[in-house]
A protein has these predicted regions:
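Gly/Thr-rich phosphate-binding beta-strand-loop-beta motif of the actin/hexokinase/Hsp70
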Residues: 2-20, 100-116
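Short, polar loop motifs at secondary-structure junctions
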Residues: 64-68
Length: 189
């Protein structure tokens, strides 16, 4: 078996990985302004950095919202599309070896995928808030999109300054029948 290259052309990043008989090889993330530039940039950088010849590749599998822009084989290689939710479910099952799990894929948006028995995979929901929201808000409010800088800033912060607590909206604890939280606690507790 030769190598299969998996490429997730997302809304803001392209993720690429190779799989061969020995397992997963060298994951990589590439950012670009448009999906086609991101796809070809990721593919070229991946095979160059890892010393992979086009002859070593049996197949290219594409997924993600940006993969819809690709309707021809990449560099003459066998190229197919797969459902992003199926790919997320299969990938999480493969990595975790769990038979039953919920996969939370937080990209530009966030999706929830249910895996049952390691075989039945279904998309159970999602929200439009994810890493793209964090990057956009960080760019506007903090003047940086660099996630490492954002994390450093967050580590210096005081969570009580932004995390709404029950005592902030109610001066008495909620009845036990509604929750176990006391007035000074947050949902994180």
């Amino acid at each position: 078996m030769g190598m299969v290259i998996g490429i997730d052309v997302g809304g803001s990043t392209t993720k690429i990985i190779g799989v061969d008989k020995e397992g997963i090889k060298h994951p990589m993330i590439v950012k670009a302004e448009d999906p086609i530039t991101s796809l070809f940039g990721a593919f070229g950088k991946y095979i160059y950095d890892n010393g992979i010849s086009l002859n070593d590749i049996d197949k290219v599998m594409l997924t993600g919202v940006g993969s819809a822009y690709v309707n021809q084989p990449l560099y003459g290689l066998s190229t197919d599309h797969t459902d992003e939710f199926l790919a997320n479910g299969l990938g999480a099952h493969y990595n975790s070896q769990l038979q039953d799990l919920i996969v939370v894929s937080m990209g530009t948006g966030t999706s929830f995928v249910k895996v049952e028995g390691g075989k039945n995979i279904s998309h159970i929901g999602g929200i439009g808030i994810g890493g793209g929201t964090i990057q956009g808000l960080s760019r506007l409010l903090l003047k940086t999109q660099n996630i490492h800088q954002v994390v450093k800033m967050a580590e210096k912060g005081v969570i009580e300054n932004i995390d709404l607590q029950i005592k902030d909206i109610c001066n008495t604890p909620l009845p036990v029948s509604y929750t176990h939280l006391r007035a000074h606690e947050t949902c994180a507790d």
